[in-house]
Design a protein with these regions (language model features):
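Metal-dependent phosphoester/phosphodiester hydrolase catalytic core
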Residues: 1-354
């Protein structure tokens, strides 16, 4: 892990970035292993790779050594990494830790093949397996910090409450794909992606989540988070999200349909977009079907690399979704894909595209 961090930090543009700007970094999964939880990881094999606890400890130690953050307080668990920042009278930002402090093991579709047998089986799977209580995402101490920070922000009259969130929060079912869609995607996708097309079609036909590693795999924990924010007087969250290699603009709601805020998701800097291997036409088709299949998804782009630029003033927020023309050369062009204007409203957040 130290060698890999050193490799990244040797990049001249990474050095310039760290020299020029303060950063508030969050980890997700690949700082340790793919899809970790408190007791292991999807891509950790104890028989060949030893103790998960030792591997995680090494990963987190290297992360603290190489990233621009303070070391934990004496006696504090390195995995208990959550923070709150107040930006004057403008905003509060609270960052979440969703991997190493409380997360229950992910549910895998492959372990429940019967969930795809019928709509009744899929509904049972979502309700009683994925939706089972007692599967936490956040540590209780972190939830206390988050809700106390949100309540303090509301009391002080700050207009904005931001959540630094490693993984997608919105309800995102797999896209519903027609026979014609499948034909188009099968002709556009490389051979190793054809199995993925079939999985998307199966899940989409039954209204099952696109993925179960994000908050969609922990709906009871998500409802608990929303309830805490609501009790703090904060149903106007701006949730800033990474992980998915895609751009997102999502309208968040609790199970009763009450608005909880907006989620702004950024694509990867250099990692391929989630649908990039389907080519431009295939990626656009999948984006359109995701929007059609999900009331919470206002817009998404799974093709481009880039970044999200968010500017806050007391009266409005402006979110620019910026794509880069290439990640293979130092010279590149910028293209603003969408611009969202957001204003505080009486019932949460109002927004429009401009």
């Amino acid at each position: 892990y130290r060698t890999r961090h050193a490799q990244y930090k040797a990049d001249p543009q990474s050095r310039r970035l760290h020299a020029a700007h303060p950063m508030i970094p969050l980890w997700d999964d690949h700082e340790s292993a793919n899809n970790p939880w408190v007791g292991g990881a999807e891509n950790h094999q104890p028989g060949r790779e030893g103790s998960w606890q030792q591997r995680r400890a090494a990963a987190l130690q290297a992360w603290y050594e190489w990233m621009p953050v303070r070391d934990p307080a004496p006696g504090q668990n390195r995995g208990d990494y959550w923070r709150s920042f107040a930006f004057g009278d403008l905003a509060t930002l609270v960052t979440l830790e969703t991997r190493h402090s409380a997360r229950a093991q992910q549910i895998e579709y492959g372990d429940h093949p019967g969930a795809l047998a019928s709509q009744e089986a899929a509904d049972h799977f979502l309700r009683d397996v994925v939706g089972a209580t007692g599967r936490p995402m956040l540590a209780p101490a972190m939830e206390t910090l988050v809700m106390d920070s949100l309540a303090a922000s509301v009391r002080s009259g700050q207009p904005w409450r931001l959540i630094g969130n490693p993984i997608p929060m919105a309800r995102t079912a797999a896209p519903r794909l027609s026979a014609a869609d499948l034909t188009r995607l099968s002709s556009a996708a490389p051979a190793h992606e054809l199995e993925r097309v079939a999985r998307l079609a199966e899940r989409g036909a039954l209204g099952l989540p696109l993925y179960l590693d994000p908050w969609d795999g922990y709906p009871a924990a998500r409802e608990q988070f929303y309830a805490g924010a609501r009790d703090a007087g904060a149903s106007d969250l701006l949730v800033l999200t990474g992980d998915s290699h895609s751009f997102w603009a999502n309208a968040l709601h609790d199970a009763s349909g009450s608005p909880q805020g907006l989620e702004l998701g950024t694509s990867g800097i250099t990692s391929p977009g989630d649908f990039a291997l389907f080519g431009e036409a295939g990626a656009r088709l999948l984006d359109e079907r995701l929007i059609d299949s999900n009331p919470e998804v206002l817009w998404t782009d799974g093709l481009h690399n880039g970044y999200l630029r968010l500017r806050l003033t007391p009266s409005q927020a402006v979110a620019d979704y910026v794509a880069v023309s290439t990640v293979l050369e130092q010279e590149y062009g910028l293209n603003r894909l969408r611009r969202m204007h957001i204003t505080p409203g009486s019932g949460g957040l109002d927004w429009e595209w401009r």
